[in-house]
UniProtKB/Swiss-Prot annotation:
CDD domains: ALDH_StaphAldA1. The active site is at residues 256, 290. One of its GO terms (molecular function) is aldehyde dehydrogenase (NAD+) activity. It catalyses: an aldehyde + NAD(+) + H2O = a carboxylate + NADH + 2 H(+). The keyword Oxidoreductase applies. Pfam families: Aldedh. Keywords: NAD, Oxidoreductase. It comes from Staphylococcus aureus (strain MRSA252). This is Putative aldehyde dehydrogenase AldA. Belongs to the aldehyde dehydrogenase family.
Length: 495
């Protein structure tokens, strides 16, 4: 299937600052390609420090009036954004598929609808938020107000470009902040097109979108004196740099980082449900998911039943053209990611690991122009193996046999990460006990990789700081002000 790219994507994009697309301070551009075909999709502006200065100044000026708008006004605008996203769902989903390589069935059903739902959700959250009043005694009253912080500086990863942007933009502007956000230089196109919706709905300067290299303009955003709050989704290595910038400037930061999550299959699991959940955990979005269930811990009593079923299921996955609605797995997002995956396959071959399924790049039937990789299942002897400890970020699943629930818990916790995990069991008490014992921010029971609004998402340990996607996330973008009132008119007599 082929589409006319220009029906969806412009040949060039400027920076979106103060409600319009503008030229950058430099003529430098970055080529944006389709990872499934190698074709050039567009060229984006390579922002420089001067452009960051401009965007932050505009956001500061817009904050003065935006922060004073009523909650109901902001809520209505967020709803309008969500409605317009859904009205253009098919177009934006195709842009996401063209630019990211993920299947159209995923972008149509998940990426864009869930982005829209986050705008609707935070419209309701801000509209129903209430302050508090505490009568400390008969003459004193304490009022608690939640006020916006100011200018938010955000950078999002390349694996869910539009959805991750919505996770940050929706609560930030709902709370009354303005934002300067930068998508990945490899997958910026969906957010740039959605800028046209912001242009229709929001006052100028509330949302500003820069494009460029993370090490250049992204770093400049995080280290700008005019930015009052940082928000980042990406690797743990870069997360450290963002945390350092936040500490240096004494501003708060929300960090959603890497993971190496354990998916635990107990001996009483519904195996049909487990096989589907395992695939959801590691094959969804080609395994390019921070919460991927990339360590499979299988009870020894069912290991010999489950593994052959997984081998068959993995071999039947349709990997191919992301625009084909029958495709279940598309292209990895780029050559660097493909090479990284291959390096782990090579490490497996040189060790005592056993490749049970997959393990190869796919190049037949026209796939040689993209970065397609087979669903891969690898048995490792224990959790200390390189493949069980390091985040691969691809459709590569390591499987480890466990003897009981406690060993599963111990192995699940034997990781520097703590983002997510799963438990499959028909005994809810048993599953809950494991869920409580595993030190991660999210545990799915009898499903995996569900990311709805209204449920907090974020990690323990080196997987991040803070939570997103639920009403408590609004507080990430607010400051608390206390107004303390003395109504007694009485002197205290101390001076």
């Amino acid at each position: 299937m082929a589409v006319n790219v220009r029906d969806y994507i412009a040949e060039n994009y400027g920076l979106f600052i103060n409600g319009e697309f503008v030229k950058g301070s430099s003529d430098e551009t970055i080529e944006v390609t389709n990872p499934a075909t190698g074709e050039t999709l567009s060229h984006i502006t390579r922002a420089k420090d001067k452009d960051v200065d401009h965007a932050v100044k505009v956001a500061q000026e817009a904050f003065e009036s935006w922060s004073l708008t009523s909650k109901s006004e902001r809520a209505q605008m967020l709803r309008d954004i969500g409605d317009k996203l859904m009205a253009q769902k098919d177009k934006i989903a195709m842009i996401e598929t063209l630019n990211n390589g993920k299947p159209i069935r995923e972008t149509t059903a998940i990426d864009i609808p869930f982005a829209a739902r986050h705008f609707h959700y935070f419209a309701s959250v801000i509209e129903t938020e209430e302050g508090t009043v505490n009568d400390i005694d008969k003459d004193t009253m304490s009022i608690v107000r939640h006020e916006p912080i100011g200018v938010v500086g955000a950078v999002v990863a390349w694996n869910f470009p539009m959805l991750l942007a919505a996770w940050k933009i929706a609560p930030a502007i709902a709370a009354g902040n303005t934002i300067v956000i930068q998508p990945s230089s490899s997958t910026p196109l969906s957010l740039l097109e959605v800028a046209k919706i912001f242009q229709e709905v929001l006052p100028n300067g509330v949302v500003n979108i820069l494009t460029g290299k993370g090490s250049e303009s992204g770093n400049a955003i995080f280290n700008h004196d005019g930015v009052d709050k940082l928000s980042f989704t990406g690797s743990t290595d870069v997360g450290y740099q963002v945390a350092e910038a936040a500490a240096k400037h004494l501003v708060p930061a929300t960090l959603e980082l890497g993971g190496k999550s354990a998916n635990i299959i107990l001996d009483d699991a519904n195996l049909d449900l487990a096989v589907e959940g395992i695939q959801l955990g590691i094959l969804f979005n080609q395994g390019e998911v921070c919460s991927a269930g990339s360590r499979l811990l299988v009870h020894e009593k069912i290991y010999d039943q489950l593994v052959p079923r997984l081998q068959e299921a993995f071999s039947n996955i349709k990997v191919g053209d992301p625009q084909d609605e029958a495709t279940q797995m598309g292209s990895q997002t780029g050559k660097d990611q493909l090479d990284k995956i291959q390096s782990y396959i090579d490490a497996a071959k040189e060790s005592d690991a056993q490749i049970l399924a997959g393990g190869h790049r796919l190049t037949e039937n026209g796939l040689d122009k993209g970065f397609f990789f087979e669903p891969t299942l690898i048995a490792v002897p224990d959790n200390h193996h390189k493949l069980a400890q390091e985040e691969i970020f691809g459709p590569v699943l390591t499987v480890i046999k466990v003897k009981d629930d406690q060993e599963a818990i111990d192995i699940a916790n034997d990781s520097e990460y703590g983002l997510a995990g799963g438990v499959f069991s028909q005994n809810i008490t048993r599953a809950l006990n494991i869920a409580k014992a595993v030190r991660t921010g999210r545990i799915w029971i009898n499903t995996y990789n569900q990311v709805p609004e209204g449920a907090p998402f974020g990690g323990y340990k080196k997987s991040g700081i803070g939570r997103e996607t639920y009403k408590g996330a609004l507080s990430n973008y607010q400051q608390v002000k206390n107004i303390y009132i003395d109504t007694s008119n009485a002197l205290k007599g101390l001076y």
